[in-house]
Amino acid sequence: VSDANAGNAQPGVLGRPVASGLAVQTIKNPQSSARPVVFLDPGHGGVDEGTAGTTDTGEQVTEKAMTLSVALRTATILRADGYTVALSRVDDSLPGLPASAYTADGTMLTADGVLTDLQRRIDEANASGASVFLSMHFNAYSDPSVGGTQTFYDSTRSFGAENLRFATLIQNTVISAFHQQGYNVPDRGIADDTQLQAESLGTLPSSYDHLVVLGPGLPGRLRPTKMPGALCEGLFLSDPQEATIISQPAVQQLLAQAYADAIEKFLTTRPSQ
């Protein structure tokens, strides 16, 4: 979740509680093990709902449910095309965190706990040997008329140009998919993650104004991802129209297909190093 204008918090880490769960799963397609590994990061999970919205018919839609559904659908598409896919979670939970990550009553993550969970996602992406990282989220804003798709990247990394290329592919492919199906979703474009002015977490200094899952490392404090990546805010759940759209399984599949198409195009057109 990011603020529609400045985004003053890390996506998916607005101090909400989380629950422990299963470890990350990496599943290979045995027929084509030579293809690159893709890491998908569905935001939130367990009792951490992320943001939430209400459809035109009064149905509640949670970010954690939508990110998981879209991520699993994306993984299915990619695996069918021969890619190996790893995910940061595979059900409505989060992999286990130490007790110290939680508040005294165990119902919330501390700021350090949030950072620990984000570091877990980064470490799992690195351990998977992935060639690309996509973090999936949905947005919210106080004005319910605000909507659209936006994708973030980090320009300061050594592979910043590839981050930009990937974010551009994600954004353009998603917007095109929505528009082709008659959904007039606003194109909020791509943005460098420093434009979010994201709040620092745990032991990170206040000057660290990057999204943790995309940004550079800090010696002794943060280990960064080792591959190009982007974070996409698919729609605004605070907009009843967009909450209604994404509540439909067919639209979840549409978004998953767009993500998969962008990922495959990124990997198959990647410049030689």
Describe the residue ranges of each PLM region.
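Short glycine-rich His-centered loop
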Residues: 35-60
